[in-house]
Structure formats: C-alpha cells, structure tokens
C-alpha cells in the first residue's frame, strides 16, 4: 500500500438539482509510485481509507482525481464559504473543475502539495503575501498598450465529433487559447506539455459562437484555414471561454473604430496640404466639350451632326411666367425649373388670400392636352335581350301545387296499368244464315278462299267456286266439264 503524502478534511462543492452545497469529506493525496499513479481520493469519513474491507469504504461520486489530468491549482474567492475562516481553491482537470475548501493554513498547504505532485517538472512558485520586496530607485511605468487578453485564457478542451472536426482530423484533448485577434488550438504532449499551434480561427471570420454548461461551440466561415463548419469542444469552462471571446471581439471592434478615425484625420490633413499647395483645378465639363478634337478622334467616313439649338419643353415655365427679352443683352441661361418653387409659393399665398376655388398652377391649358379617345366600355350600359340571355329551357323545381294541410306536394296516386293481352288469331268468318250467296262476292281486295259458302238449292257441292276461280285466276276448276 502506498503511503499518503497528505490527508485531512476538505469541503467539496457539489451541484444537484440546480443548488450548490458544500459537503465535508476526508481527502487523501497519494504520490506517483510503481504501485499506482498520483491521485487524490475522497472518502466520507476518516476511517474509510485505512484497512477495512473493500465494502467498508463508501466513496463519493467524485471518487479519484488523477493528478496527471490536472491542469491548474489556484486559490479562489467564494461568496459563501462552508464555514467561517475557510478559504477555497480550484482544481481544474481536462474534463471538469472541482471547487475545494479548508481552513486558511490547510488550504495553502493543500495547494502547495498538489502543485508539487501534479507538476513535478514544472516551475511553480507561490506569490509572497507579506513583506513584499522594495523596489530600487529605478522607476517602472506600466505600458498602456499592453493587452494581456490571452494571458490566463488557455483552456483544456475535448473535441466533439462533428463533420468539420473529422475533416480536419481533430480528436482527443487540446488546449484552446483565446488571443487578441483569433482563437488558437494547441496540441498537447504526453506529459501535458503544450506544443505548437495546430489551427487558428480569426474573430472576423467566425459566423457565430455560443456556450453551454459543458461545452463551447462556434461556426467557422469559408475563409478560415479549417474551412467552414461547426466545432464543438467539451469543457466545464464554457462560460469563461465565451466571456473571453466576447471581450476580445469588443476590444478589436473598438480598435477598428479608432483606426478609422485616424484614417479620416489623415485624409483631412492631406486635403489641407493640397489646398495649401494651390494645385490647378481639373478642367470642367464645358472645357472638355469645347476642346478641339484630336487627329484620330473620329473615323474618316463618319458624319458630324451639326449641334441644333436646344428647344424648351412644353411645360418648362409656368403659365404666368414671362420669357426673357432678346435685347436685354447676353445672359447665361438659367437652369430648368429654377423658379418653380418660387411661383408655387406665390400661388399658394394667392390662393389663401383670395378665392380658394382658383385653378391650380399646374392645370393644362385648353387645347394642349390631347383628349384621350373614348373606348368601347367607357360608359356603362344596361343589359339588353335579357329574355334571350337568361331564358331557361325547362321549368326547374317542383311543378305540383303545395298542400299546406299535409305539408307536402299534392302528388296524385299512382295509376295501375293493366297488362296488354296478346291479340287472338282471326278465324274464318261464317256468314249468317239467310244471307245471299253466289256471285255477290266479287271483291278484288279479298284473298282467294277467304270466305266459305254453303251449297245452294241445286245441291251442287262446287256451286259458284268454278266462277270465282275462273274469274280470279282464269284456271278451270276440277268440277267443271
């Protein structure tokens, strides 16, 4: 079993359900040895670390802190200490930050012992608190241009897996440095030694940035060395990184505004020097127009159009204005609409003092404004031939009268249709007894043998048949001789 370098009571601050509270623990610091690594262990009470079985010790959620992962150990000031006279110190690792507290002498001893075991090869010293050394006769003045923005702004971060991080090959733990003009990502060696810079992102090329309780993230632009994309770093100091970046951006913005002010002053001074030197003014546009043409200014076969005098437009002057006389001498032509507002003010004053129904100044004179031609649909017309356009082919709706007694329409009862009987075949018609027979049947419309006649008094069985056959068909019957 390794021997402990230091042990004693320590207050550990924990946060659960949004509330922070101090919990008293028993801390034991073990140095690095062949049997184990340098570590700081926490227990509920004093007897938990010595002997006993494995089940006799009940440790907290934060069981062991490996000193190899320790980044910094520094005293801090807290608003609510766990007990009167206690001082706190912060122990930062690559994953999270721990806030510890003890009485003042024990807290200083803990910080010194932790630094000695966590940074054996580093150079660390504690600042003396009493009897500071007196300065020599040499006076020192602070430099107002010194900007310690990046000092103390190095944070241990762990790169989260994103598309941009995979494209740049970033994975694992790094150190993120917040500088005056950019964010720089530094690589870390095996012994937690900071190596050379790996990537940098200028503040002017960051689209947006933000933080969370456990991470810090920003979105890089297309012009960044890493290319566009979102980079997310897991850290417990996301709020500190966010504030440092925001402060650096505000300071850079203020410096940019100051630089713009210096540029304006330089431009003003340059203009003053030019004015004092009395440099010739550049030629005006009229001089350029009046200058003689060059030798090859126009092609040989080009035609020059003679300048024609400019004509005034129709409404260049108001109606009540008087044109200048030609014999008054040579005067420069006044610009167009030079007295427009003056006449308008006069007309407004005249309208207020006199009849308000006077015509406005910009009314067009008669005969000048063309009358627009009347279109086909200018005047509304009443529709005609409604009986033909709106006629209906058949009456719609109910055509039967309404019966209010039965609250229904007077529909007649359905009629029962009798089935039609099939026509009976017509048999031979027998004449009534006592009717005349013989040659009385000579109708050409009746068919042959349409009537059967009985024999007469002579008793001949084919009486009359031979005549009918002879008269009708011209063929002699069998009974004829």
Curated annotation (Swiss-Prot):
The modification Phosphotyrosine is found at residues 296, 337, 341, 362, 377, 398, 409, 449. InterPro entries: Docking_Protein_DOK (IPR050996), Dok1/2/3_PTB (IPR037751), IRS_PTB (IPR002404), PH-like_dom_sf (IPR011993), PH_domain (IPR001849). Residues 151-259 form the IRS-type PTB domain. Constitutively tyrosine-phosphorylated. Phosphorylated by TEC. Phosphorylated by LYN. Phosphorylated on tyrosine residues by the insulin receptor kinase. Results in the negative regulation of the insulin signaling pathway. Phosphorylated on tyrosine residues by SRMS. DOK proteins are enzymatically inert adaptor or scaffolding proteins. They provide a docking platform for the assembly of multimolecular signaling complexes. DOK1 appears to be a negative regulator of the insulin signaling pathway. Modulates integrin activation by competing with talin for the same binding site on ITGB3. The PTB domain mediates receptor interaction. Belongs to the DOK family. Type A subfamily. One of its GO terms (biological process) is signal transduction. The modification Phosphoserine is found at residues 48, 269, 291, 416, 460. One of its GO terms (cellular component) is cytoplasm. Residues 270-293, 307-329, 404-481 are annotated as: Disordered. Residues 4-119 form the PH domain. The modification N-acetylmethionine is found at residue 1. It comes from the Eukaryota. Interacts with ABL1. Interacts with RasGAP and INPP5D/SHIP1. Interacts directly with phosphorylated ITGB3. Interacts with SRMS (via the SH2 and SH3 domains). Residues 310-325, 436-458 have a biased composition (Polar residues). This is Docking protein 1. Keywords: Acetylation, Cytoplasm, Nucleus, Phosphoprotein. The keyword Acetylation applies. Pfam families: IRS, PH. Expressed in pancreas, heart, leukocyte and spleen. Expressed in both resting and activated peripheral blood T-cells. Expressed in breast cancer. The keyword Amino-acid biosynthesis does not apply.
């Amino acid at each position: 079993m390794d021997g402990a370098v230091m042990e004693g009571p320590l207050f550990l601050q924990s946060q659960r359900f949004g509330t922070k509270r101090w919990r008293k623990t028993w801390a034991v610091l073990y140095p690095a040895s062949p049997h184990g690594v340098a570590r700081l262990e926490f227990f509920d009470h004093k007897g938990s670390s010595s002997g006993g079985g494995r089940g006799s010790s009940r440790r907290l959620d934060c069981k062991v802190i490996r000193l190899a992962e320790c980044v910094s150990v520094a005293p801090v000031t807290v608003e609510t200490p766990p007990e009167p006279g206690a001082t706190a110190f912060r122990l930062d690792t690559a994953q999270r930050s721990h806030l510890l507290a003890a009485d003042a002498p024990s807290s200083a001893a803990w910080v010194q012992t932790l630094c000695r075991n966590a940074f054996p090869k580093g150079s660390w010293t504690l600042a003396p608190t009493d009897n500071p050394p007196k300065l020599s006769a040499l006076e020192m003045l602070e430099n107002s241009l010194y900007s310690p923005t990046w000092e103390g702004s190095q944070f241990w971060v762990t790169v989260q897996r994103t598309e941009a991080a995979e494209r740049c090959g970033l994975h694992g733990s790094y150190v993120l440095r917040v500088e005056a003009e950019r964010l720089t990502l530094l690589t870390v060696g095996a012994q937690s030694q900071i190596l050379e810079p790996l990537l940098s992102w200028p503040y002017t090329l960051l689209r947006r940035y933000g933080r969370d309780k456990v991470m810090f993230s920003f979105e890089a632009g297309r012009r960044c060395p890493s290319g566009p994309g979102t980079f997310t770093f897991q850290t417990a100091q996301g709020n500190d990184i966010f504030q440092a970046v925001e402060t650096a951006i505000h300071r850079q913005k203020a410096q940019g505004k100051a630089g713009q002010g210096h540029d304006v002053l330089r431009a003003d001074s340059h203009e003053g020097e030019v004015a004092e030197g009395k440099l010739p003014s550049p030629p005006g546009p009229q001089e350029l127009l009046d200058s003689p043409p060059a030798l090859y200014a126009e092609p040989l076969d080009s035609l020059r159009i003679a300048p024609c005098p400019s004509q005034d437009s129709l409404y260049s002057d108001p109606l009540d204005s008087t044109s200048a006389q030609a014999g008054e001498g040579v005067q420069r032509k006044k610009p167009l609409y030079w007295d427009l507002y003056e006449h308008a003010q006069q007309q407004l004053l005249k309208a207020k003092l006199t009849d308000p129904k006077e015509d406005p100044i910009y009314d067009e004179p008669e005969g000048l404004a063309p009358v627009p031609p009347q279109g086909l649909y200018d005047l509304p017309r009443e529709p005609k031939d409604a009986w033909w356009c709106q006629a209906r082919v058949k009456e719609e709706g109910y055509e039967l009268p309404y019966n209010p007694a039965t609250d229904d329409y007077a529909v007649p009862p359905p009629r029962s249709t009798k089935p039609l009987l099939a026509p009976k075949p017509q048999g031979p018609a027998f004449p009534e007894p006592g009717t005349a027979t013989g040659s009385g049947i000579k109708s050409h419309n009746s068919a042959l043998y349409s009537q059967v006649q009985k024999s007469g008094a002579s008793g001949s069985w084919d009486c009359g048949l031979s005549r009918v056959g002879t008269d009708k068909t011209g063929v002699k019957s069998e009974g004829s001789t």
